[in-house]
Amino acid sequence: MKFFVRVLPYAALVVLAGCETVQTTDAGAVGVTREQRVTTMVSSQEIEQQAAKEYAQLMSEAQKKGLLNRDPQQVARVRTITQRLVPQVAVFRKDALQWKWESNVLTSKDINAWCMPGGKMAVYTGLIER
């Protein structure tokens, strides 16, 4: 117990030292100034690489199950919409324009869509059909 009490303050300092405040949007870009505390222990590049790897794995699994991009018209519609949205990200994060944006449609009754770091997106058919 004594060891824990002595080590805890140092561990807390290490964690706090790895944090910084960042703006997630350009100040006042949409009438909002949003700050978040994030850790710098993992670089943005590492996060984006891991997200790309995870996204590729998810899409591969969906393809094996026959759930990936089954309806060419839906895929075309989603990609047209996302291609129109991507240029707008500069309002929030200028660096996001450089991401390798990708969007796919997953067959699911769920009403959902998501985006991973680095611009990896998925839209569920439930969102389109309902």
Feature-to-residue mapping (PLM):
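Bacterial N-terminal signal peptides that target proteins for export
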Residues: 1-11
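C-terminal motif of bacterial Sec signal peptides marking the signal peptidase cleavage site
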Residues: 15-18
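Peri-catalytic and regulatory segments of divalent metal-dependent proteins
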Residues: 21-130
